[in-house]
């Protein structure tokens, strides 16, 4: 694209999208749209190449830089542009949600919504989330079994009898007492445990003073459980350090690891780690992408974030954090003292994580097509786990959704799955149902893939994309249409490759594995149906049943076999063949 072909650009904050046809190549934000976009034509390296490859430019003016930052993040997630830094392992880590109701409940969710609820997380380790949720359920009597929003019940549940719920669903809870419990749960989730323990100790002493010894004992047990949990589950630092996040980063060539540690009340609450593989991205671009994506959802926010090196344009991020937290959040690069030593700790651990990742890749012996696939589709890293999806049916009925899994470019058949579908003769509806159930049903806890392959054209691919959106997920996906072996994207873009291309060969193998997985189900079903019919026919014993199953496989083929052919089979007689044909004639068509 030439500079003279640019649309008129304002000197205001906003977001710009470099495009090649309908494909978005890069999304960026700017204090001045005009100055930032025009700078691409005087730049070198990646920026210059983006301008040269682009055939068009869209822009959206915003009121301020914070709005531009938010819009940039949303557009990057929506379009996953080729030249933006995309974080690997964007697996939608779970959050704890304290619902916005008169009697709130605590839920595990994977999406943060603008619904007035309070969100805590993300929790990168499922075990940590499980432990804190179990602790809260045991020690604090929030409602648990009356749904969201709360449904009225006729009788209280067992939790009420055990003292673990105040039973607001049957009108037994005092609103003021319930809100006191909510406040205590918030203190635990925000890491303000020391203050909560002091408060509980005062209540215990007051209960003892009133001779309410049973209540005092309950509070004592609650305090001991909290102390035990927070002394064993978290690494203690200096309590004077308070609440903060600190980050470390390590890099080797195109591969980088960024880690963030969350410290609350002087204790490490958790660590979040991301892997990025982007040849041309600078360290600053990688760290900025991590900060933007993490702090758009993370909650609660600390008053201090320690960065490993300075970044340009941190003012917009600091302002965004201030608006989200309702107070100032300082972004600082300490050079000495205890906080600088925290950064050294984070960098050492990021370096260890990077070395582990490199050794794992070396041991895996990654398939050479994975790098070709990454480059072809503009993925943030080599796609280690691939899942292929296929819809098959038996004579227009019994539609089946089949899943094949590759890891490191090789089949992982122990994780192949199949599911019967409810959708009728609509292939698109069947694909949407199958993909949605894969990520919300009994298979939802399987690892998320780095790339989805859909057996079909743009219609099936878009149906899969709708299912992912309904499930609250953003995963790269592509379709492979039979016949011409053309790759298609959800936007309708076609990628035509020579059959010798390693990425295409790998995807064809994956698609065929998914298809064969479905066919195996239908063969098994035909055999079971035939076995059922043969069981009730006089003169057809176990040996003859086995022979007919091996020879014909299904009911239709057996019905079409001539009488003379059946009679000539080893172990069969003309009388047995006639009995078989008579029984088959009475069988309802499949």
From Swiss-Prot:
Protein's recorded name: UvrABC system protein C
Any one Gene Ontology BP term: SOS response
Complex and partners: Interacts with UvrB in an incision complex.
Localization (cell): Cytoplasm
Any one GO cellular component localisation term in the record: cytoplasm
Chief subcellular location: cytoplasm
Molecular-function GO terms, alphabetical: DNA binding; excinuclease ABC activity
Keyword line: Cytoplasm, DNA damage, DNA excision, DNA repair, Excision nuclease, SOS response
Record flagged with keyword DNA repair: yes
Described purpose of this protein according to its UniProt entry: The UvrABC repair system catalyzes the recognition and processing of DNA lesions. UvrC both incises the 5' and 3' sides of the lesion. The N-terminal half is responsible for the 3' incision and the C-terminal half is responsible for the 5' incision.
HAMAP family tied to this protein: UvrC
Record-annotated UVR domain positions: 194-229
Assigned protein family: Belongs to the UvrC family.
Domain of life: Bacteria
Keyword GTP-binding: no
InterPro entries the record matches: GIY-YIG_endonuc, GIY-YIG_endonuc_sf, GIY-YIG_UvrC_Cho, Hlx-hairpin-Hlx_DNA-bd_motif, RuvA_2-like, UVR_dom, UVR_dom_sf, UvrABC_protein_C
Domain GIY-YIG: 11-85
């Amino acid at each position: 694209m030439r500079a003279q072909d640019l649309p008129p650009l304002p000197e205001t904050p906003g977001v710009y999208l470099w495009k090649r046809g309908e494909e978005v190549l890069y999304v960026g934000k700017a204090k001045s749209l005009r100055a930032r976009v025009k700078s691409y034509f005087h730049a070198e390296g990646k920026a210059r190449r983006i301008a040269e490859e682009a055939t068009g430019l869209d822009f959206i003016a915003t009121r301020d830089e914070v709005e531009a930052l938010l819009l940039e993040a949303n557009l990057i997630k929506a379009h996953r542009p080729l030249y933006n830094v995309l974080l690997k392992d964007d697996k939608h880590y779970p959050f704890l949600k304290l619902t916005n109701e008169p009697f709130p409940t605590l839920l595990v969710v994977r999406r943060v919504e603008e619904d007035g609820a309070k969100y805590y997380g993300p929790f990168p380790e499922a075990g940590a989330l499980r432990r804190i949720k179990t602790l809260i359920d045991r020690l604090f009597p929030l409602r648990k079994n009356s749904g969201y929003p709360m449904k009225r019940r006729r009788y209280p549940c067992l939790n009420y009898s055990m003292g673990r719920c105040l039973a607001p669903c049957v009108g037994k809870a005092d609103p003021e007492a319930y809100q006191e419990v909510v406040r205590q749960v918030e203190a635990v989730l925000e890491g303000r445990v020391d203050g909560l323990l002091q408060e509980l100790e005062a209540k215990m002493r007051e209960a003892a003073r009133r001779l309410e010894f049973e209540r005092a004992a309950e509070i004592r047990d609650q305090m001991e459980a909290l102390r035990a949990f927070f002394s064993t589950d978290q690494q203690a630092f200096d309590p004077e350090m308070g609440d903060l996040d600190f980050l470390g980063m390590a890099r080797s060539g195109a591969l980088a690891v960024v880690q963030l540690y969350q410290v609350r009340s002087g204790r490490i609450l958790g660590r979040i780690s991301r892997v990025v593989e982007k040849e041309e991205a600078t360290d600053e671009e990688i760290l900025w992408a991590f900060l933007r994506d993490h702090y758009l959802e993370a909650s609660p926010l600390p008053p201090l974030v320690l960065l490993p090196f300075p970044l340009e344009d941190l003012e917009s991020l600091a302002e965004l954090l201030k608006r989200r937290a309702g107070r100032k959040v300082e972004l600082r690069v300490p050079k000495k003292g205890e906080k600088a030593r925290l950064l050294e700790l984070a960098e050492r651990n990021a370096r260890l994580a990077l070395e582990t990742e490199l050794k794992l890749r070396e041991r895996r012996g990654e398939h050479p097509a994975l790098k070709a696939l990454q480059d072809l589709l503009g993925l943030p890293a080599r796609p280690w786990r691939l899942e292929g999806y296929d819809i098959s049916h038996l004579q227009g009925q019994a539609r089946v959704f089949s899943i094949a899994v590759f890891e490191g470019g090789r089949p992982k058949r122990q994780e192949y799955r199949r599911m019967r579908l409810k959708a009728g003769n609509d292939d698109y509806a069947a694909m949407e149902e199958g993909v949605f159930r894969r990520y919300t049903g009994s298979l939802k806890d399987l690892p998320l893939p780095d790339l989805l392959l859909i057996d079909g054209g743009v219609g099936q691919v878009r149906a899969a994309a709708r299912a992912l959106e309904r499930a609250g997920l953003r995963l790269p996906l592509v379709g492979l249409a039979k016949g011409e072996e053309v790759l298609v994207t959800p936007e309708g873009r076609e990628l035509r490759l020579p059959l010798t291309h390693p990425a295409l060969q790998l995807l064809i193998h994956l698609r065929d594995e998914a298809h064969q997985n479905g066919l195996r189900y239908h063969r098994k079903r035909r055999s079971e149906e035939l076995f059922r019919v043969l069981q009730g026919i006089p003169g057809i014993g176990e040996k003859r049943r086995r022979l007919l199953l091996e020879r014909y496989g299904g009911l239709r083929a057996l019905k079409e076999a001539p009488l003379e052919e059946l009679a000539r089979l080893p172990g069969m007689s003309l009388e047995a063949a006639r009995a078989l044909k008579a029984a088959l004639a009475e069988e309802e068509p499949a």
